[in-house]
Curated annotation (Swiss-Prot):
GO cellular component, one term: plasma membrane
Naturally occurring in which organism (per UniProt): Bacillus subtilis (strain 168)
Keyword Signal attributed: no
Protein name as it appears in the record: Lipid II flippase Amj
Membership in a protein family: Belongs to the Amj family.
Listed transmembrane segments: 1-21, 31-51, 84-104, 105-125, 161-181, 192-212, 245-265
Gene Ontology biological-process entries: cell wall organization; peptidoglycan biosynthetic process; regulation of cell shape
Gene Ontology molecular function terms on file: lipid-linked peptidoglycan transporter activity
Function, in words: Involved in peptidoglycan biosynthesis. Transports lipid-linked peptidoglycan precursors from the inner to the outer leaflet of the cytoplasmic membrane. May serve as a defense mechanism against naturally occurring MurJ antagonists.
Pathway(s) it belongs to: Cell wall biogenesis; peptidoglycan biosynthesis
Membrane topology: Multi-pass membrane protein
Keyword set, alphabetical order: Cell membrane, Cell shape, Cell wall biogenesis/degradation, Membrane, Peptidoglycan synthesis, Transmembrane, Transmembrane helix, Transport
Length: 269
């Protein structure tokens, strides 16, 4: 059986899109602080997170079907396929970073429309997906330039936040994949292992909400109120997205050990 199949490529593109959306979600806070509408920016951020989470749930049955089709030598084949999918997460995150400056400008307009349209997300999407909306969006597209790193200092990088977000991203990236692989390692407890994926992703989401999001949100508020410089929020956001790349790379190392840990953990349920 071939490792790279049409279905694997489909899931690869799906994960690429999911991680691009999650990376670009960080642009909403930058945009909100830029135009002074933090609450509206948070609303747009929540929409993007919900879309990415829902998309992640949609791809899970397709990923699970890879195991059903693996046949003989499933551990080796599925292991290679899942590593390729994790690579898709890395590519998607890098794509999100490349598009970040463009989407900061794009989301700034979207947030203004959201605030001016009475908080109607539907109206924002209707304008955004119109013919004129596409033309306007294309005018904002630009590749990152060397000027984007102007004013950079190492002291602007919140190192603890980088490590925390990297670990959380790695857990979230392999949550479903390690759980499915654990089902192959312990076939007699495969259902228990697969169901554990929801718990793992739930814990990762909770850690993100407790340790990462509040710090970035408070910083965005301070910038909007003029208490701190915009450059601090900019480099905190850059820290977050680069730590996401590091997290997806760390996920390659954690994938198999994570699967064995889940397989062992299922003994206690």
């Amino acid at each position: 059986m071939h490792v790279i199949t049409t279905q694997v490529l489909f899931i690869f593109c799906f994960l690429l899109l999911i991680h691009s959306i999650e990376t670009l979600a960080y642009a909403t806070r930058l945009s909100g602080a830029r135009v002074g509408f933090i609450a509206s920016a948070l609303s747009l951020f929540n929409v993007m997170v919900i879309v990415s989470r829902m998309s992640n749930m949609v791809q899970q049955p397709f990923t699970g079907h890879l195991i059903d089709d693996a046949g003989k030598n499933a551990l080796a084949i599925v292991g290679e396929q899942f590593r390729f999918l994790i690579f898709g997460s890395t590519v998607g995150t890098i794509l999100g970073i490349i598009l970040l400056p463009s989407f900061v400008a794009l989301f700034s307009r979207a947030i203004i429309h959201l605030a001016g349209g009475g908080g109607s997300v539907f109206q924002v999407f209707r304008k955004g997906f119109s013919k004129q909306g596409f033309k306007n969006a294309l005018s904002y597209l630009r590749l990152p330039s060397i000027s984007y790193v102007k004013g950079f200092h190492m002291r602007l990088i919140p190192k603890r936040l980088f490590v925390i977000n990297m670990l959380i991203t790695s857990i979230y990236t392999i949550g479903v994949l390690s759980a499915l692989y654990a089902g192959l390692l312990a076939p007699e407890r495969s259902t228990t292992a697969v169901m554990a994926s929801g718990l793992i992703n739930g814990i990762a989401t909770m850690l993100l909400a407790i340790f990462v999001d509040p710090k970035v949100s408070v910083l965005a508020d301070d910038v909007a109120k003029g208490k701190r410089s915009y450059i601090y929020l900019k480099w905190t956001s850059v820290t977050m997205v680069t730590s996401r790349v590091a997290g997806t790379l760390l996920a390659q190392l954690m994938f198999i050990p994570g699967a064995y840990y889940i397989a062992w953990l299922t003994k206690w349920f």
